[in-house]
Amino acid sequence: MHRFRVLSILLLAVMLTSAACAPQATPAPTAPPPAPTQAPTAVPATPAAVQPTAAAAPAAGGFTVTDALSRTVTFSQPPQKVVLAGKALFMVADAIYTFPEAGQRIAALGSTGQGSGNFIPMIDPGFSSKISLKSDAGAEQIAAAQPDCVIMKSSNAATLGKSLEAINVPVVYVDFETPDQYQRDLKTLGTLFQNEDRAKTVAAFYQSRVDAVTKATAALTDDQKPRTLVLYYNDQGGTVAFNVPPMGWIQTLMVQTAGGRPVWKDANLGNGWTKVTLEQIAAWDADAIFIVAYFNPVNDVVTKLKADPQWQALKAVKNNQLYGFATDVYSWDESDTRWILGLTWMAGKLHPDLFPGLDMKTEAQTFYQDLYGMDATTFQSNILPKLTGDVP
């Protein structure tokens, strides 16, 4: 019995010693702290410093985006390889780049330039490393970039968009053609990038400036609204042509919002720019004429027109109200992000008494700072030298 007790004690001691020497189980790693669920809305001070804000964590099962065609597109997480494609791309790109995530999320894009230049390289230090697509790139070329989202204007849906959808590439359509569409499409991008705070900030930037103009012009009677004409000058092909925009385009909406009366509203307008004769321009004899020139220096065009005897007979020329539309990298009349500058500038030209002290250079600097994080030095060197048109 005594021997058995001794053996038992010895056996127990061996077992305890073995347990003490055995390797300990590695504890399970703790989960990393969750990413911030709200992105800061402030834009960094300089383009080079613009960093993507932390995207909100998508809800379980992902999130759904409703685009300009009322389609719903579901994502499991914010897209990391975005492609911008289709026609009229630069207008869409400029809006997308108001989100600081854009620079790192966009993997490939088509041409973002126009006749007067290319803005995106000024604000995206990584622009040269992105895949450059041809303007007529098809679905296969776009798919080769392996995007998890393609963004394009809805006008491309029936052609390029349909082909991408057929091979299961997620496509989100936007318009960015009118003030109302800007509010809607910014909200769409806010959901897509999971940065709704930034979408609200940019939308508020636009709305506050529209409200400032409409408040100033709200009490005007029709007789107090100058008869106004917007003309697109084009001499491509060696023949000079003047064109007026459709009633639903941003140029017409600018005139109406800025407190003017578009004289071409009863013309036989098409879906795009409509050519008009000099005889028709003379018949309208508008109080104020705004000249747009996308592929010519607008100041040179205005100088040429003022020297023409036929134009010298017009009321607007006699009263020094023939204006070259304000332009920097792109013209401010287009449905590019700069339309808000164009609206403010036009209102100041039509009703200088309602906008005393309006300084469009200051307005432009605020625009680039608030929407693109461009500091004063960069604005002075990259934007201000390009500012042309009737801007004092």
Which residues does each predicted region cover?
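Bacterial N-terminal signal peptides that target proteins for export
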Residues: 1-8
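Bacterial N-terminal signal peptides
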Residues: 9-18
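Bacterial Sec-exported substrate-binding components of ABC uptake systems
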Residues: 19-94, 197-232, 355-392
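Short helix-initiation/N-cap motifs at beta->coil->alpha
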Residues: 68-70, 128-140, 177, 268-278
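A short, structured surface patch at a secondary-structure boundary
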Residues: 84-143, 149-155, 263
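Extracytoplasmic ligand-binding site segments that recognize negatively charged/polar headgroups
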Residues: 109, 114-117, 157-161, 175-186, ...
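Structured C-terminal subdomain patch of bacterial secreted/periplasmic proteins
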Residues: 186-191, 197, 297-392
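Alpha-helical, coiled-coil/dimerization segments enriched in small aliphatic residues
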Residues: 242-272
